[in-house]
Structures are given as C-alpha cells and as structure tokens.
C-alpha cells in the first residue's frame, strides 16, 4: 500500500474486500535479494534500476495487480516515420478478458537494438484506460521524436536513434 495516508486503512480495506479494483503500478524495482545489487561503491549503472537489470527481479518497475485480466493485441503505427514537429500514433487493442470491469496502465517501453552499454529498455509513454469486462479498447498513444532520443555520452546531448528494417 506504499504510503497510503490518513485514509489508507479504508482504501486498503476497499481493495481487500473487492470494492475497488486496483490498477496502480510500481514506481521502483523490487530485487529478489541484495545479491542482485552491485557493490555500493560501484557507480556503474549495470544491474541497477529496471533499465539495466540483467536478472529477473522479484517485482519489476511498472508491475501491478488487478482483480481482472487483460490481453494485448498487435500494436500498429499510423506511419513508419516521424518528421520534425510531428508525432506517430501507436494503437494497441487491449481486451478485458476477466470477470470485472477494470483499469489498465498501458506502458510503452523502447530499446535500442544492439546497444551493449545503454539501458535494456526505457519507459517512454503510458496511458491509463478503463475497460469494461468482455470488451476491447483501441488504446492510442502519441509518440514524438523525443520519445526516440537517447542520451549520448560523447556529445552530452540527447540524439535521435535511427535504425533500419534489420533492427
């Protein structure tokens, strides 16, 4: 329940007794043990945070529970490229396959294929949507050019990562 505040007891009871269907997501990674963490004096990012983990954590960044279940369909883009000042729209069909109405937090993680030094993936966008039981919503998430930029240590700036069809 993290830091639930003065109404925390009531909120937790509502979840436990099924009066509220939770949809929150973890803002941090929970490691299985301290053995998964690098030495405290090692300032490398390897093995730290969800973006650099190489082992499976106990609960990853973005993990959450619900009293219902969701199934994702195949995502599609409205265009294969982004021009300056424009956006692409990612559309993902999300179905509520469970017994209860619920909310899902659709999370968009991007990675740079072949990158051995940078993060394995990074959260770039998300959208919380209410989906009635037995229905499918077409969730649309706009992505700008900045969503595809990565920090470059050589120039100390964010640069647009481009790839070819092989990536």
Regions found by a protein language model. Give the residues of each.
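Intrinsically disordered, low-complexity Pro/Gly/Ser/Thr-rich segments with frequent PxxP/GP/PP motifs
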Residues: 118-150
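Secreted, periplasmic, or luminal enzymes acting at the cell surface/secretory milieu
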Residues: 1-103, 107-110
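Short, contiguous acidic/charged loop-to-helix segments that flank catalytic cores in large enzymes
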Residues: 1-4, 80, 126-132, 156
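Conserved small/polar residues in nucleotide/adenosyl-binding loops
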Residues: 161-167
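Short glycine/proline/serine/threonine-rich loop/turn segments at secondary-structure transition edges
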Residues: 147-160
């Amino acid at each position: 329940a993290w830091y639930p505040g003065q109404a925390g007891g009531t909120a937790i009871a509502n979840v436990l007794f099924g009066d509220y269907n939770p949809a929150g997501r973890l803002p941090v990674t929970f490691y299985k043990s301290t053995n998964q963490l690098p030495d405290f004096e090692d300032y490398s990012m390897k093995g730290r945070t969800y973006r650099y983990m190489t082992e499976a954590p106990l609960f990853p960044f973005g993990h959450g529970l619900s009293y219902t279940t969701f199934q994702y369909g195949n995502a599609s883009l409205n265009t294969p490229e982004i021009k300056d000042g424009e956006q692409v729209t990612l559309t993902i069909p999300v179905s509520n396959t469970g017994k209860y109405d619920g909310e899902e937090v659709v999370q968009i993680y991007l990675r740079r294929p072949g990158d051995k030094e940078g993060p394995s993936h990074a959260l770039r966008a998300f959208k919380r949507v209410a989906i009635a039981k037995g229905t499918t919503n077409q969730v649309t998430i706009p992505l700008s050019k900045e969503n595809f930029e990565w920090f470059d240590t050589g120039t100390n700036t964010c640069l647009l990562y481009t790839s070819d069809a092989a990536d």
